[in-house]
Amino acid sequence: FGSESLNARFNAIPGTACADVTVPRDWKNPEDGHTITLRVAKTETSKGNPERQGIALVNPGGPGGSGLPWGPAMAERAPELAEQYDFIGFDPRGVGQSTALECTYTPNPEHDVWQDTKAQVDACLENELTPYITTEQTVYDMDFIRAVLGEEKTSYIGYSYGTWLGSWYQRVFPQHAHRFLLDSAVDISRDGLQTTWDLQPRSRDRQFQDAMLPYVARHDEIFGLGDDPMQIRQRWEDVGGTRTQ
């Protein structure tokens, strides 16, 4: 969303307000004088309810996904929960309308995908903000948002990478964690997210094999690729597709 369309959308949701919150660039060295801003949206829907459960932060995953619209969106999509929770959407550091991480590079049409990716990575490494765009720094941001809102604890809804983020929060701030809903969970027992990326090709291939191909086969009148899933797969591989081993 652009800022104008986003603000217009939020203004149409009763009880929603946006704010910029200033936090240290480095929570491990907050006295160094460097700060960044976080854009936060609060949708207050539980005020006056004697069964109010507090706030619930929301993160859609990524990493790199904008969470700002998700607080207001959850209030609309889950009205029963909204009676008990005020949903908090926020753009994590480096993302969206928070202090953004900008990696400026010029694509080279002669580069293959790996060379182009390396150029992007090198450009990001030149940005002095990059070392501070981490999960650990972000969970400190989340706890600061909780504290600014005057809440003793926070609940949380996270999807995909957002489950990794939520698990980190619980590990660092267990005393402030209330109810956490982790959907499409990342394996927090691993040393890092790389194992997730390693597994994704096989996961995507299984979805293609078990869901997409049978669907195409059932609708041959639309796609015209035949009614046998394995034959359709073979045709796909013949024109350049690859099978994940």
PLM-predicted stretches and their roles:
Residues F1-Q245:
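Gly/Pro-rich cap/lid or specificity-loop segments adjacent to the active site
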